[in-house]
Amino acid sequence: MNFPILSSLILLPSIGALFLFFTKSKSENKITAKYVALFTSLVNFFLSIYLWFLFDQTTSAFQFVEDRIWIKGLINYKVGVDGISILFIILTTFITPLCIISVNNSVTKRLNEFLIAILVMETFMIGVFCSLDLVVFYLFFEAGLIPMFLIIGIWGGARSCLLYTSDAADDSGC
């Protein structure tokens, strides 16, 4: 099979994020942005399910390996999946549409940027789970912290953290 399915899984959310980046973020365009992000993440989910059906469970070797020379003799873009990483990829692509669906009223400002951050984070998470080169793993892992930091810093807050902790304390009988 010559189709680079893992690279497609990695790049598809980034393409959706680029599309959202170049669309205007007016109030009437928020629903369109959400549908574009949801469509992109659902296509990625079904692509990961397709990957699961193509996966040979009788072998423990890495499958769907793509190896490209990045810096000769130093770094290769090498991705592949085994029995554990494919489950994490499917889990990531399953949770992302749920996150996009669940932002109905919780994200009121900068919805477009929030959806871009979610899709970019999905890109980096899938890259982490299928990277076979240590440098590529490190780059995906560290780059994944950037959208996570933005999501927590912009849309998270001390007030909501305080509410969640006080609610947990009430439930525990403290």
Task: Place the predicted regions along the sequence by residue.
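Transmembrane helix-loop-helix hairpins at membrane boundaries of multipass inner-membrane proteins
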Residues: 1-7, 19-116
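Hydrophobic alpha-helical membrane segments of integral membrane proteins
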Residues: 8-11, 36, 87, 127-148, ...
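Transmembrane alpha-helical core residues of multi-pass small-molecule transporters
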Residues: 12, 40-43, 95, 121, ...
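Alpha-helical transmembrane segments of multipass membrane proteins
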Residues: 17-21, 100, 126-127, 150
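Transmembrane-helix signature of multi-pass solute transporters
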Residues: 46, 124-127
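Alpha-helical transmembrane bundle and helix-membrane interface signal
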Residues: 104-111, 153-163
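Conserved small/polar residues in nucleotide/adenosyl-binding loops
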Residues: 164-169
